[in-house]
């Protein structure tokens, strides 16, 4: 909980330094992604999946729901996430409640929040987008977190650097992600680079209201010595 308090206090302090033009009304967003493989922070979480997303935002504050369901195997990850976030200028801060169909609760109950028998993972994040470079830090602070080498809660963390650029009519992003210390959550025994990735996206429009981004990417995990090539597309409203 100390980590969460630090994130919230730091976010409030930084937010006070920004003056932004806020939106005048509540805005909504809907999207459905279809991916050939579910790759997250360098980890393989399943084969072909459908991933719906729904969100609302107002004056920098946002609430979103996101899910993932495997299409080819009953053993693939099923996931449902809720995220409360705030952004001002390039700064962002948020809290996410992840729920997976595997964890400490053998019955996979969603409304099971007991600290030692839940499938939920609670994560705080803070970051800044400089335009040419983005930095993001994530830390688990409650729920089904991993443990360190002493068997204690690891407060599993992940740090990511992203660099966007345009090339041959596509939007690209190069990403390097690392886990700073040992945790069973990411399968690391100390500091480890867990993702080196490159992704290309090209958008197509259907009428005036529907956008269809098509993307492909390569994600390598030097820690686990795995590499994944995936593709996907989304319908965005």
Language-model segments: residues:
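Cleavable N-terminal export/targeting peptides
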Residues: 1-27
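Short loop/turn motifs that connect adjacent beta-strands in outer-membrane beta-barrel proteins
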Residues: 22-27, 94, 165-173, 201-214
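Outer-membrane beta-barrel initiation region
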Residues: 23-57
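Residues that define the transmembrane beta-barrel architecture of outer-membrane proteins
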Residues: 26, 46-50, 76-80, 89, ...
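Transmembrane beta-strand segments that form the barrel wall of outer-membrane beta-barrel proteins
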Residues: 30-38, 61-71, 93-101, 108, ...
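Detector for outer-membrane/organellar transmembrane beta-barrel domains
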Residues: 112-183
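Outer membrane beta-barrel transmembrane domains
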Residues: 171-206, 215
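Outer-membrane beta-barrel "beta-signal"
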Residues: 198, 204, 225-237
